[in-house]
From Swiss-Prot:
Component of the A-type ATP synthase that produces ATP from ADP in the presence of a proton gradient across the membrane. Has multiple subunits with at least A(3), B(3), C, D, E, F, H, I and proteolipid K(x). It is a multi-pass membrane protein. The lineage of its organism: Archaea, Thermoproteota, Thermoprotei, Desulfurococcales, Desulfurococcaceae. Coiled coil: none annotated. It holds the Pfam family V_ATPase_I. Its main location: membrane. This is A-type ATP synthase subunit I. GO terms for biological process: vacuolar acidification. It comes from Aeropyrum pernix (strain ATCC 700893 / DSM 11879 / JCM 9820 / NBRC 100138 / K1). Keywords: Cell membrane, Hydrogen ion transport, Ion transport, Membrane, Transmembrane, Transmembrane helix, Transport. It is found in: Cell membrane. One of its GO terms (cellular component) is proton-transporting V-type ATPase, V0 domain. GO terms for molecular function: ATPase binding; proton-transporting ATPase activity, rotational mechanism.
Length: 685
């Protein structure tokens, strides 16, 4: 769970007559990750399978578009049987079998794309017409006139515009009409043939733009807008109709997708296979737990006529190997977040377990409102779940965490609902002057302004504690990764001294959990050389030792390796400089936790007071105030929820992962056909 699984690298050689059965057996079991052919072994790859793999991959991608058209995630069905007499011939036969389904969805997708393109075109035309939409004149016809030049300009109105336009047009014996409305203006100009090109640059310099009648719509802007509205409505209905039609044959589409992805995986196996006479050779990786199963399957498929060469069991090394990550089911969705940064290497700690705790916690501290957290939770369960189950699970957990932090902050849809539910009184009954995570606006709302500095200070402590923990823990995990990778040089040169430096500086925030106390210790350590404080002296000693270690380790290691120590000194200087920059930049970066929490409570406080002010004018005012409060909650939940997720992810990716996690691994993807039985020569797998 904390480390990728140990994998065994094997080279498998089997007779050509048995190879199809071996491929089918291993694909059904899904335990063998096929890699590039073994180096140094003579043989050739059947290039025809590359073309078939390309076809299957393109088909698979296209089918996923068909699922998107129906508004559902791609899925496979079980119980599908593929009868194989030859992989290439069978592929063509099954394409023919499902050609009707493919033609149906291909036509729908083409029609949908055309309707979408037309809708986008109409929206662009609508935006162009909007400035002159009130004109009920066939402008396009006037533009085509052979007797005179005509043009319409639009823009922002400025004092004296009429006289300046009139002066410009009169010089060529033309006419101009200026219509101002609010801060906007429309100018129509008619001049003798050929004169427009002479005066148009001057008119454009008045901060006006020229209107060009779009093609394909009525020439009158007002009629064009009515036409566009009608077309938009018609196209909208057609798009909905196409999506409904796409849902009618999802069962057949899922079966087709199951077959196509099965062939796609089989072809991935075959393109990595070497042909050498009557022998087929393939190289790959298997989980050490499945080594026995692999040998048993191959032995059964070949009746003992095979050679399996083990190249060793390892977790990483010079040659790249895939990473197999095993996680409990309740943690797997969080791997989607980790994979946004990158996949773990086989010899580094998998951060998913830790992230599943720290990401919801960070999000909740930034977004402390039980009501809006509940909205996030419900949004995940009832909408996002249809788009992605994994992301719905992650967001639901984060929403649930916000429900808890909101209760601790005394916030449920802002102050108004919190008071209606009696949440502030609950904390009073528990013997607390304020809720444990109350924001400064809570004190202002309850007439306890003297508590504002206390609550700001409390939020500051929480932010700095989280930052200190994640930074020190991240550099510690960097040390652990160095040990796992046996990167002894990297450990001595950078990982250990960086951990010592970070632990020394962040330690006071963890020990005292008080920004003032921690700041006092750091001040004595850095400005008074420790003063009379033992803690400050420890901080100073750790910091100086960490920096000195970082600066000296490089030159010494370079010298021991027979290189110039000056090159090592330059590298060490950059390492020390980068570490100091991280310290200076990363710790304050965690103050965004406090900043977003304060911003959220302030927004809700403003909405609350506006609502209270409005709701003092009768029934209608009460309705308006209620709508404002509900709409404000929805807007803040959407905006602040997105911001909190973005900033929580940033703290993990840039401030935390950069200390220990590379994310440059390759996932272990065994060849696997899901929901498929393969029948070869009367034998079913």
């Amino acid at each position: 769970m904390l480390l990728p699984r140990m994998l065994e690298e094997v080279v498998l050689a089997v007779p050509a007559r048995d190879y199809d059965r071996v491929v089918a057996g291993l694909a059904v079991e899904g335990i063998f990750h096929v890699d590039s052919p073994p180096q140094g072994v003579k043989g050739e790859v059947d290039r025809s399978y590359r073309a078939l793999l390309t076809q299957a991959s393109e088909r698979s991608s296209r089918i996923r578009q068909y699922f998107d058209l129906a508004g559902v995630e791609p899925y496979r069905v079980s119980g599908v049987e593929i009868e194989v007499g030859g992989w290439g011939e069978s592929w063509k036969r099954y394409l023919e079998k499902y050609s009707g389904v493919e033609k149906f969805y291909s036509g729908l997708l083409e029609e949908y794309s055309e309707a979408e393109a037309r809708l986008k075109e109409l929206l662009d035309i609508e935006a162009r017409i909007a400035p002159v939409a009130h004109l009920d004149v066939d402008i396009a016809r006037l533009y085509r006139s052979g007797a005179f030049d005509f043009a319409v300009y639009y823009g922002s109105y400025s004092e004296g515009l009429e006289s300046r336009v009139g002066e410009i047009v009169s010089r060529v014996g033309g006419l101009a009409a200026v219509e101002a409305s609010g801060g906007s203006v429309v100018v129509a100009v008619a001049v003798p043939k050929g004169a427009l090109s002479k005066i148009s640059p001057e008119i454009l310099r008045l901060n006006l733009s020229i209107y060009t009648p779009p093609e394909g719509v009525p020439g009158s802007p007002r009629e064009a807008m009515e036409y566009i509205r009608g077309e938009k409505a018609r196209l909208g209905r057609r798009l909905v109709s196409i999506q409904e039609m796409a849902s009618e044959r999802l069962g057949e589409l899922a079966e087709f997708y199951t077959v196509v992805t099965a062939f796609e995986n089989i072809f991935k196996f075959l393109v990595s296979t070497l042909r050498r006479g009557e022998t087929r050779i393939v190289r790959g990786f298997v989980d050490v737990r499945d080594s026995g199963r692999l040998r048993s399957i191959v032995d059964r498929m070949t009746r003992g006529s095979y050679v399996l060469l083990s190249l060793g069991v390892r977790r990483g090394g010079e040659a790249p190997i895939p990473s197999k990550v095993d996680l409990p089911q309740f943690l797997k969705p969080f791997s989607r977040v980790v994979e946004l940064y990158g996949y773990p290497e086989p010899n580094e700690i998998v951060p998913t377990v830790f992230l599943a705790i720290t990401l919801p916690l960070t999000f909740a501290l930034m977004f402390p409102d039980a009501g809006q957290g509940l909205l996030v939770l419900l949004f995940s369960l009832f909408y996002l779940r249809r788009v992605s189950r994994d992301w719905a699970y992650v967001i639901a957990v984060m929403g649930g965490a916000s429900v808890v932090s909101g209760l601790l902050a005394g916030e449920v849809f802002g102050p108004l609902v919190s008071k209606m539910l009696g949440l502030p009184e609950l904390w009073y009954r528990l013997g607390l002057e304020t809720p444990p995570y109350a924001m400064p606006t809570y004190a202002i709302d309850h007439g306890e302004e003297e508590l504002v500095p206390v609550l700001v200070y409390r939020a500051l402590n929480v932010s700095l504690f989280m930052g200190a923990f994640m930074l020190s823990f991240g550099t510690f995990l960097g040390v652990v990764n160095g040990v796992i990778k046996r990167d002894w040089v990297g450990l001595v040169e950078s990982r250990l001294p960086r951990f010592l430096l970070f632990a020394s500086i962040t330690g006071p925030f963890l020990v005292y959990m008080d920004a003032g106390e921690a700041g006092s210790v750091l001040r004595q350590a850095l400005l008074e050389l420790g003063g009379d404080s033992i803690a400050a002296k420890l901080v100073l000693a750790g910091s100086v030792l960490g920096l000195a270690w970082m600066l000296l380790a490089g030159p010494i290691i370079y010298m021991l390796e027979g290189h110039s120590p000056l090159a090592g000194l330059a590298n060490s200087f950059l390492e020390a400089y980068e570490s100091l920059l991280m310290l200076v930049g990363n710790i304050p970066s965690f103050l965004r936790i406090m900043a977003l929490a304060l911003a959220h409570s302030s927004l809700m406080f403003v909405i609350y007071y506006l609502t209270v002010m409005i709701m003092q004018g009768g029934i209608l005012a009460d309705v308006v105030g209620a709508l404002l409060y509900v709409g404000g909650n929805l807007a803040v939940a959407a905006m602040e929820g997105l911001l909190a997720f973005a900033h929580a992810s940033r703290l993990h990716f840039y401030e935390w992962f950069s200390k220990f996690y590379s994310g440059t691994g390759v996932p272990y993807t065994p060849i696997k056909v899901e929901g498929v039985r393969i029948k070869i020569a009367g034998q079913t797998f």
